[in-house]
C-alpha cells in the first residue's frame, strides 16, 4: 500500500511537467533597432569617373577616389571630412590634378537595409595643370548623394555621385576667373564602427 501511495503521489507531482509549455525569454521593451545612432562612425572609400562640365571639349573624362571619415550626431545626421584626388587630361595631353579637402554634413535616411546619404561640404582645393601651374588654395563646394546597401553591421556598399564647384579667382587678372564644375559617378563602400 505504501508503495502504491508513493507511486500515485509521484505521478501526481510530476504529471504537471508533461503538459508544461516552454515560453522563451521574450521581453519586449518597445525598443526599435536603428541602423545608425549618435556616436556611430564610418570610413568611406569611393572610386569614380570625373566628368568635367564647364570645359567644353577641352577636358576629357577622368577619374579619382575619395577617402572620408564621418561621425553621427544622431540617427540621421553625420559630420566629417574627406579628401578626393582627381585626374583629367586635356586635348593637348596636359593633366589637371585637383585635390579637394572638405568638411561637411550628411543626412542619412534609411529604409530597412538601404541608406540614402545626401550632403554638402565646403573646403579648399589645390590644383595643378600640366605640372607647372599650381593654384592653392581654391575654394571648393561639394554636393553629395548616394545609395547604399548594408551588408552587415560593419559594411555597406553602393553607388555615389558628387557635384563639385571649384572656382579660380585672380586678383590681378579678373578676366581669367573661371568656375570649374565637375560631376562624378562611382562605386563606394563604407566601414561602420
What spans do the regions from the language model cover?
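Sec-dependent N-terminal signal peptides
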Residues: 4-14
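Acyl-donor (CoA/ACP) binding surface of acyl/acetyltransferases
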Residues: 166
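Short glycine/proline- and aromatic-enriched beta-strand/turn motifs that initiate or cap beta-hairpins
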Residues: 20-73, 78, 188-193
Amino acid at each position: 500500500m505504501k508503495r502504491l501511495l508513493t507511486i500515485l503521489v509521484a505521478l501526481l507531482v510530476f504529471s504537471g511537467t508533461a503538459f508544461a509549455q516552454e515560453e522563451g525569454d521574450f521581453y519586449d521593451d518597445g525598443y526599435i533597432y536603428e541602423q545608425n545612432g549618435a556616436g556611430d562612425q564610418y570610413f568611406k572609400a569611393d572610386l569614380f569617373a570625373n566628368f568635367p562640365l564647364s570645359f567644353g571639349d577641352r577636358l576629357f573624362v577622368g577619374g579619382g577616389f575619395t577617402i572620408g571619415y564621418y561621425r553621427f550626431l544622431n540617427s540621421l545626421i553625420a559630420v566629417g571630412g574627406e579628401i578626393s584626388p582627381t585626374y583629367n587630361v586635356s586635348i593637348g595631353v596636359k593633366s589637371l590634378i585637383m585635390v579637394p579637402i572638405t568638411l561637411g554634413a550628411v543626412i542619412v535616411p534609411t529604409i530597412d537595409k538601404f541608406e540614402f546619404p545626401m550632403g554638402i561640404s565646403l573646403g579648399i582645393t589645390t590644383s595643378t595643370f600640366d605640372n607647372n601651374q599650381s593654384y592653392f588654395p581654391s575654394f571648393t563646394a561639394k554636393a553629395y548623394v548616394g545609395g547604399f546597401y548594408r551588408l552587415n553591421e560593419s559594411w555597406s556598399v553602393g553607388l555615389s555621385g558628387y557635384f563639385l564647384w571649384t572656382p579660380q579667382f585672380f586678383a590681378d587678372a579678373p578676366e581669367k576667373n573661371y568656375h570649374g564644375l565637375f560631376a562624378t559617378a562611382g562605386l563606394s563602400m563604407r566601414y561602420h564602427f
